[in-house]
């Protein structure tokens, strides 16, 4: 594409008072811009009309908007997709954070424009990846309440849906549920659940195809091109689908492990699931002797919130126990009912059910249960630490003890997947994702056959950065396999996952990325002639987007890709690039920075800022009128994981005095939009020492800092402290070479 460049400089919003537009026009002239205009109201209708006229009459096809942050006015500065657009941030990151009229302020603006022009020249319009055999079908795995709801809602939205259930009948956990907690005012009365009605609705929906007594034998391919093998009654069927909802639910925690609660010592110590089955079957009797239950005690958090068992709260157990206590009070208001609890977590309107049970005479005892024993007369007594009195107490004798066991996601069942060991000499890897071979999806992915799980085995992702997401593009867990939740939440979760699946097939079929770079039409391209089969890209991709062939060559799957560029940062041969983002592009942007010689005493600091948290924080610092060191030159990157170490070498060779990597927080409470890009960058920094030793430079010249988007008020001190440290080291000895 032969480029004809138009540069449009805004002098409004204080930019013109802070920076000389004529000096910026001169920079545009240095880069052979065919058109250069300055306007006090560049986002106004008249100015936009002039830009469009230049496109039509002057043949401008590459546009630089030197004005406000690229994070704003995206709908205003929106040009045809065959035009290349570059936004240069003169407002938030120059005019609003630097003193007006200063030489350093102008030099910062000039470098920002130079870098923008280089990026523009290196960019090409993205060509979306679109295949002829894309599918928009939705596969739902799991035929319980969540799965049936997801399938029904997706079909009602007009999408063909395939539902796979391992049992012969649909329903999952709710097949054995007697009644449900209240969801309507006055939130005191339990509600009936008609599974047959939901099943009938599903059966009558023409867009739903149901496989029962079946399992997913394998899933290969990528979003809109998932090839699914479904095994049923010894036969195998093939389906091509666009996205997958995983709704395989959870199972109760194994009560046999609860020896401290005497499970297994008496048949009258049962689980909440056992009691639900009793009520469903209409036969609620003591297992020991078949007599009616005259009194009952519930022990909450049986295994949950316990570091020896399930460290987390299972969310629904409290309300389930309140519901079951209500069963007894409805049958006979005189039945003694005890509930032993740590905390009653009856959120929202469930609090009204809790209050109703207090009115019904249920006795609540707050404290940890220390023992359940036979009283010698064929009944049970519970010993507990009473939080209110600080003393141990013993309950009245009861006929039945119900343990409210927690929930374990089906994704947490199975043996750990063994990750291939890194090649000898490879850098220390970031901790691998925890994947268990649970036989839910059987993915044909290089990084493992199932969704990666978080700390407790739930295949969720960061709840702020990735709502409803997983670490595998196009696969959305829902219901209790995603997180602990109750029936009502599971139904809502099913609809959310169905909507995400629909969003995915629509975006991918148009050649666009999904969250977080939603709408991006670029994708990584591989120059295979230089590939050394080092496996760095296949191992480090956070989303499992790259498989390998038998010779360890990377096999990219463009529709799995989230466009983070982590593979680009990983590649030592620099064979991976995007149409609008490449190693050479950023390297040339660094090389275009004007670096004064050492006698001018104007050091230059390169800031590689993650576009997701760090760059917005820099914007917010400017919006808040906070000033920081004028030696800083900011280049936004898709993710710190996309930073290739050659950029560090380029910057130091250029004479840049210090390099600062500003990215998202990593670790257990990570905030990286690409999961572990920031962590990967931190790991790669271990190689920087080797580079600096080779260049005979101090290691303090390169630093990485983690910031949240809310840390904008800390930005000035962070940058000023770094500038002070670099200044104390003296000029980069490569300056001027």
Identify the role of each PLM range.
Residues 1-603, 615, 627-640, 657-660, ...:
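Residues forming the flavin
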Residues 365-367, 707-737:
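C-terminal functional segments of enzyme domains
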Residues 610:
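Active-site core of glycosidic bond-cleaving carbohydrate-active enzymes
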Residues 621-623:
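Short, surface-exposed acidic-centric catalytic microdomains
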Residues 642-653:
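Thiamine diphosphate
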């Amino acid at each position: 594409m032969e480029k004809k460049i138009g540069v449009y400089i805004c002098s409004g919003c204080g930019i013109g008072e802070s920076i000389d537009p004529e000096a910026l026009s001169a920079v545009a002239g240095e880069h052979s811009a065919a058109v250069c205009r300055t306007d006090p109201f560049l986002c106004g209708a008249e100015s936009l009309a002039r830009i469009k006229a230049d496109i039509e009459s002057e043949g401008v096809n590459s546009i630089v908007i030197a004005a406000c942050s690229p994070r704003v006015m995206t709908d205003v500065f929106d040009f045809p997709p065959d035009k290349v657009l570059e936004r240069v941030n003169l407002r938030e990151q120059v005019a609003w954070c630097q003193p007006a009229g200063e030489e350093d302020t102008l030099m910062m603006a000039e470098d920002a424009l130079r870098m923008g022009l280089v990026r523009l020249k290196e960019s090409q319009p993205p060509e979306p990846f679109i295949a002829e055999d894309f599918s928009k079908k939705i596969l739902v795995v799991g035929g319980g309440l969540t799965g049936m709801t997801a399938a029904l809602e997706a079909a009602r939205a007009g999408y063909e849906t395939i539902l796979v259930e391992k049992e012969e009948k649909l329903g999952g956990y709710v097949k054995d549920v007697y009644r449900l907690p209240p969801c309507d005012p006055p939130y005191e009365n339990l509600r009936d659940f008609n599974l047959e009605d939901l099943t009938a609705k599903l059966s009558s929906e023409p867009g739903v195809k149901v496989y029962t007594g079946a399992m997913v034998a394998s899933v290969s391919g990528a979003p809109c091109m998932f090839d699914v093998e479904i095994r049923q009654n010894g036969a195998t069927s093939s389906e091509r689908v666009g996205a997958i909802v995983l709704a395989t639910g959870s199972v109760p925690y194994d009560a046999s492990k609860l020896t401290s609660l005497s499970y297994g010592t008496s048949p009258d110590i049962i689980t909440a699931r056992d009691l639900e089955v009793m009520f469903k079957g209409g036969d609620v009797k003591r297992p020991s002797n078949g007599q009616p239950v005259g009194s009952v005690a519930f022990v909450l958090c049986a295994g949950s919130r316990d570091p020896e068992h399930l460290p987390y709260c299972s969310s629904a157990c409290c309300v389930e126990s309140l519901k079951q206590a209500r069963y007894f009070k409805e049958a006979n208001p005189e039945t003694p009912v005890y509930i032993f609890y740590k905390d009653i977590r009856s959120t929202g309107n469930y609090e009204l059910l809790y209050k109703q049970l207090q009115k019904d005479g249920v006795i609540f005892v707050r404290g940890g249960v220390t023992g359940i024993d036979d009283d010698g007369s064929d009944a049970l007594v519970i010993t507990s630490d009473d939080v209110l009195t600080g003393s141990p107490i013993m309950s009245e004798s009861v006929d039945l003890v119900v343990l409210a066991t927690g929930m374990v996601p089906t994704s947490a069942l199975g043996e750990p997947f063994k990750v291939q060991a890194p090649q000898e000499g490879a850098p220390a890897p970031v901790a691998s994702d925890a994947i268990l071979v649970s036989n839910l999806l059987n993915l044909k992915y290089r990084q493992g056959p199932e969704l990666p799980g978080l700390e407790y085995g739930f295949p969720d992702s960061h709840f702020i950065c990735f709502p409803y997401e997983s670490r595998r593009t196009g696969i959305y867990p829902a219901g209790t396999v995603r997180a602990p939740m109750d029936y009502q939440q599971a139904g809502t979760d099913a609809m959310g996952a169905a909507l995400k699946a629909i969003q995915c097939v629509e975006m991918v079929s148009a050649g666009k990325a999904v969250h977080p770079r939603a709408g991006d039409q670029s994708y990584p391209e591989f120059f295979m002639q230089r590939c050394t089969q080092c496996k760095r890209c296949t191992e480090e991709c956070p989303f499992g987007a790259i498989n390998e062939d038998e010779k360890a060559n990377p096999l990219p799957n463009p529709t799995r890709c989230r466009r983070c560029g982590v593979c680009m940062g990983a590649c030592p041969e620099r064979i991976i690039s995007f149409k609008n983002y490449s190693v050479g592009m950023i390297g040339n942007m660094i090389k275009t920075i004007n670096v004064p010689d050492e006698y001018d005493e104007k050091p230059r600091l390169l800031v590689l800022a993650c576009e997701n948290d760090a760059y917005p924080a820099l914007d917010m610092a400017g919006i808040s009128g906070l000033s920081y060191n004028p030696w800083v030159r900011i280049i936004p990157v898709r993710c710190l994981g996309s930073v290739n170490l050659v950029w560090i070498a380029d910057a130091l060779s250029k004479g840049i005095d210090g390099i600062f990597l500003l990215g998202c927080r990593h670790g257990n409470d990570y905030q990286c939009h690409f999961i572990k890009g920031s962590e990967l960058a931190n790991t790669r920094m271990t190689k920087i020492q080797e580079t600096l030793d080779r260049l005979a430079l101090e290691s303090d010249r390169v630093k990485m800092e983690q910031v949240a988007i809310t840390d904008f008020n800390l930005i000035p001190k962070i940058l000023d402290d770094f500038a002070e440290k670099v200044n104390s080291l003296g000029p980069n000895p490569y300056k001027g070479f």
